[in-house]
């Protein structure tokens, strides 16, 4: 095998399978492997083109008759939290986020397992073992980090390791942060931790001077994915490129399941 063939990505198309987001529809994906010295550059390029990363695979929908999955990225520097978002921030004022190396722990897996059992027991990840989780975190040839979210008591020092309540697996791109996967302690669902972690990533991107936070696919009408449309202003990937969408352009629903 030549160096050129190793560095040139090969793309593959999956067979049709039931869509996990919209009823009575099927999905197909195009994917490639993120390996080699240029994996980070390729991940950057493909993310800009609407791909998502899962371990060492980059993929995007390639459905025959459906274009419901729309890549979205929040414009971090212009984002201003709404009244409801400010309530979420206040509700989680006792939560401290810490950036760590992409190293899996049993503490993380315990929450991951509880999260899947409570919220996604019928999903494609429902049977993931601790080894599967370790692979999800570690099998990366790009710049990846773990952000842990811990509860801090009123009298606790900020550096004390409090109870872990949420985790985000995040890629660092040339122009932003890409939230690969996030999960939280289901018993803490009243905190709206999913929303809080997105708000924290927007703040982190702004502090790092990065313009965007990539949220993955927004699917209008999908209970699982529709919430991503609430973080404005944002850009959505269309056939002509990334198009800006502001809050005034569409009605917003200020609650996340």
Curated annotation (Swiss-Prot):
One of its GO terms (molecular function) is arginyl-tRNA--protein transferase activity. One of its GO terms (cellular component) is cytoplasm. GO terms for biological process: ubiquitin-dependent protein catabolic process via the N-end rule pathway. It is found in: Cytoplasm. It comes from the Bacteria. Pfam families: ATE_C (PF04377), ATE_N (PF04376). It catalyses: N-terminal L-glutamyl-[protein] + L-leucyl-tRNA(Leu) = N-terminal L-leucyl-L-glutamyl-[protein] + tRNA(Leu) + H(+); N-terminal L-aspartyl-[protein] + L-leucyl-tRNA(Leu) = N-terminal L-leucyl-L-aspartyl-[protein] + tRNA(Leu) + H(+). The keyword Transferase applies. Keywords: Acyltransferase, Cytoplasm, Transferase. Its EC number is 2.3.2.29. Belongs to the R-transferase family. Bpt subfamily. Functions in the N-end rule pathway of protein degradation where it conjugates Leu from its aminoacyl-tRNA to the N-termini of proteins containing an N-terminal aspartate or glutamate. This is Aspartate/glutamate leucyltransferase. It comes from Nitrobacter hamburgensis (strain DSM 10229 / NCIMB 13809 / X14). The gene is bpt.
């Amino acid at each position: 095998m030549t160096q050129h063939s190793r560095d040139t990505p090969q793309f593959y198309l999956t067979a049709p399978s039931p869509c996990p987001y919209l009823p009575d529809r099927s999905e197909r994906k195009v994917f490639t492997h993120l390996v080699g010295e240029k994996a980070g550059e390729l991940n950057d390029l493909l993310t800009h083109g609407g791909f998502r990363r899962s371990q060492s695979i980059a993929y995007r929908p390639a459905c025959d008759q459906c274009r419901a999955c729309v890549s979205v990225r929040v414009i971090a520097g212009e984002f201003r939290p709404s009244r409801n978002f400010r309530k979420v921030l206040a509700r989680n004022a006792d939560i401290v986020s810490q950036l760590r190396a992409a190293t899996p722990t049993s503490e993380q897996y315990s929450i991951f397992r509880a999260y899947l059992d409570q919220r996604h027991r019928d999903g494609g990840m429902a049977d993931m073992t601790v080894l599967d989780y370790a692979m999800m975190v570690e099998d990366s040839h790009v710049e990846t980090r773990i952000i842990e979210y811990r509860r801090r008591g009123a009298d606790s020092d900020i550096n004390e390791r409090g109870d872990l309540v949420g985790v985000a697996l995040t890629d660092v791109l040339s122009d932003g942060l890409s939230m690969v996967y996030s999960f939280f302690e289901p018993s803490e669902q009243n905190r709206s931790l999913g929303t809080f972690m997105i708000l924290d990533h927007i703040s982190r991107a702004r502090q790092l001077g990065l313009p965007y936070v990539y949220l993955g696919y927004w699917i209008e009408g999908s209970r699982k994915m529709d919430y991503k449309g609430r973080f404005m202003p944002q850009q959505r990937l269309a056939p002509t490129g990334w198009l800006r969408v502001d809050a005034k352009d569409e009605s917003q629903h200020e609650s996340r399941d």
